[in-house]
């Protein structure tokens, strides 16, 4: 559902970008809330799946593969958005954050479930003591929400957005502690499309916007 919500948001963003709906639509409070809920959902699921992957111990080959794939994808996203959006390019977006959180969370994978949840509280406390981005150097943009890059089309610094990743880790660790993952049967028919989307979420994230952009350009060329 998070993937579907992401596609819906980006489709609406593209409608605005190409001038088919009112400028500023996706910057309205309700759309900003929708967008942030999507980001939190993705980060929560990323943390949950990261904990699940390493539940029996850190799999270093998986770690380095993730670093390589996410690193390449994050750099690619930054380059593409630089040429597409200029000063609003993605400098530290959700892929950059997931990559960083995957590395920073390694010491917590084998700890008590309360450890990642405590880290989540520490990062999430930003929402309490700060009202939006703070005045800060661009060199700190990866760590804390600064106003230097607040206009980016996707900006997710560790504080506060990393809290959702830690919540996902803690939730999985707690559920494992409570032995809540008892079902290991086959996938039911209606769940298979969702399972497929979950397994290929990075690919969907990377290709859906180019497909939408191409579609809007073709429509504009032949129809409008």
PLM region descriptions:
Residues 1-224:
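Alpha-helical transmembrane segments and their immediate juxtamembrane cytosolic regions
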């Amino acid at each position: 559902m998070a993937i579907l919500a992401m596609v819906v948001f980006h489709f609406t963003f593209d409608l605005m970008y190409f001038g088919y709906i009112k400028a500023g639509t996706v910057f309205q409070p309700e759309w900003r809330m929708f967008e942030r809920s999507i980001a939190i959902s993705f980060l929560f699921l990323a943390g949950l799946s990261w904990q699940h992957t390493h539940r029996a111990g850190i799999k270093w080959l998986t770690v380095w593969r993730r670093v390589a794939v996410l690193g390449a994808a994050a750099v690619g996203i930054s380059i593409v958005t630089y040429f597409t959006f200029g000063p609003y390019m993605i400098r530290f977006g959700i892929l950059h954050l997931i990559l960083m959180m995957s590395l920073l969370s390694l010491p917590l994978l084998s700890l008590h479930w309360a450890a990642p949840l405590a880290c989540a509280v520490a990062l999430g406390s930003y929402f309490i003591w700060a009202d939006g981005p703070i005045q800060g150097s661009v060199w700190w943009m990866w760590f804390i929400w600064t106003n230097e890059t607040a206009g980016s089309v996707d900006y997710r610094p560790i504080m506060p957005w990393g809290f959702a990743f830690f919540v996902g880790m803690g939730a999985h660790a707690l559920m494992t502690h409570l032995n809540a993952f008892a079902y290991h049967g086959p996938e039911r028919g209606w769940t298979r499309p969702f399972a497929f989307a979950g397994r290929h979420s990075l690919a969907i994230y990377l290709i859906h916007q180019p497909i939408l952009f191409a579609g809007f350009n073709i429509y504009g060329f032949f129809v409008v």
